[in-house]
């Protein structure tokens, strides 16, 4: 009886040991990817913040009517959702999806969705939410190529009045254990009250290259979202895998203890049987 129990525990120890090898390896890979993602995030953040300052000045000094500032009259809202292609990253994806669901549940008819990432597509399909476009297999270090494709699609949808507002839903990275889901409105732009006496004159008129400015800004914004999303994903996966490895270690300690106790019990029982047999033969 004890022998069967020992075999079962030995199998569990082998199984948990194999799982621990996988989680430890994935944790190490995620750590390396996170390090690279954080470097990329810092570079993109500087460019994005500088471009935001420039765009703010441009918007505040445009006096002509412009659909990118005044709106296009459409009541449709577009949500561009940034999720991951791979799983095993804790609550990273589900937190984003839950925020989207809470945001659109009051006005489903006027809410449209573009999803980035296999996991987001899978969740939305299960929930019966249709998508306008899907982008998958985004590289670990996203480039302007991916950002440009999405930016052009957004501009097309907005300029054709298919959507009247555009929101980006992504996870802002703060640390490996802290990320926050943000829903940022990017179109139409919002003018701010001029609080200084700054005067800017554009030559040629800024309206002549507004489309180019818009596309470059959207590319910078989307790239910033990509960078935050990748860092958040790898931070979540690293934390999840390290936690899984720690749990596996705890489980192995308990299994080793059970194995040793059972083996000790079996040895004690065998000794008792031998002693009992010897006594019976006297």
Curated annotation (Swiss-Prot):
Coiled coil: none annotated. InterPro entries: ATP_synth_F1_ATPase_gsu, ATP_synth_F1_gsu, ATP_synth_F1_gsu_CS. GO terms for molecular function: ATP binding; proton-transporting ATP synthase activity, rotational mechanism. It comes from the Bacteria. Its main location: membrane. One of its GO terms (cellular component) is proton-transporting ATP synthase complex. GO terms for biological process: proton motive force-driven plasma membrane ATP synthesis. It is a peripheral membrane protein. It is found in: Cell membrane. Produces ATP from ADP in the presence of a proton gradient across the membrane. The gamma chain is believed to be important in regulating ATPase activity and the flow of protons through the CF(0) complex. Belongs to the ATPase gamma chain family. F-type ATPases have 2 components, CF(1) - the catalytic core - and CF(0) - the membrane proton channel. CF(1) has five subunits: alpha(3), beta(3), gamma(1), delta(1), epsilon(1). CF(0) has three main subunits: a, b and c. This is ATP synthase gamma chain. It comes from Clostridium botulinum (strain Langeland / NCTC 10281 / Type F). The lineage of its organism: Bacteria, Bacillati, Bacillota, Clostridia, Eubacteriales.
């Amino acid at each position: 009886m004890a022998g069967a129990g020992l075999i079962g525990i030995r199998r569990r120890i082998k199984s948990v040991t194999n799982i621990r090898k996988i989680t430890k390896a994935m944790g190490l890979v995620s750590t390396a990817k996170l390090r690279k993602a954080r470097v990329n995030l810092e570079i993109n953040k500087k460019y994005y913040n500088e471009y935001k300052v420039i765009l703010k000045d441009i918007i505040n000094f445009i006096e002509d009517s412009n659909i990118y500032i005044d709106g296009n009259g459409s009541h449709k809202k577009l949500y561009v959702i940034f999720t991951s292609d791979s799983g095993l990253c804790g609550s990273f994806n589900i937190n984003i999806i839950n925020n989207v669901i809470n945001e659109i549940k009051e006005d489903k008819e006027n809410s449209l969705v573009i999803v980035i990432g296999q996991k987001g597509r899978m969740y939305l399909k299960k929930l019966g939410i249709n998508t306008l476009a899907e982008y998958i297999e985004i590289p670990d270090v996203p480039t302007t190529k991916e950002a440009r494709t999405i930016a052009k699609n957004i501009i097309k949808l907005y300029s054709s009045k298919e959507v009247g507002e555009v929101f980006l839903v992504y996870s802002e990275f703060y640390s490996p254990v802290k990320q926050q889901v943000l829903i940022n409105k990017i179109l139409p732009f919002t003018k701010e009250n001029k609080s200084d006496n700054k005067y800017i004159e554009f030559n040629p008129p800024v309206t002549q290259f507004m489309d180019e400015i818009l596309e470059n800004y959207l590319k910078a914004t989307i790239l910033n979202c990509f960078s935050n999303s990748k860092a958040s994903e790898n931070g979540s996966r690293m934390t999840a895998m390290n936690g899984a490895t720690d749990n596996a270690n705890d489980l192995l300690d308990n299994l080793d203890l059970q194995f040793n106790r059972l083996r000790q019990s079996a040895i004690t029982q065998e000794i008792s049987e031998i002693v009992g047999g010897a006594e019976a033969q006297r």
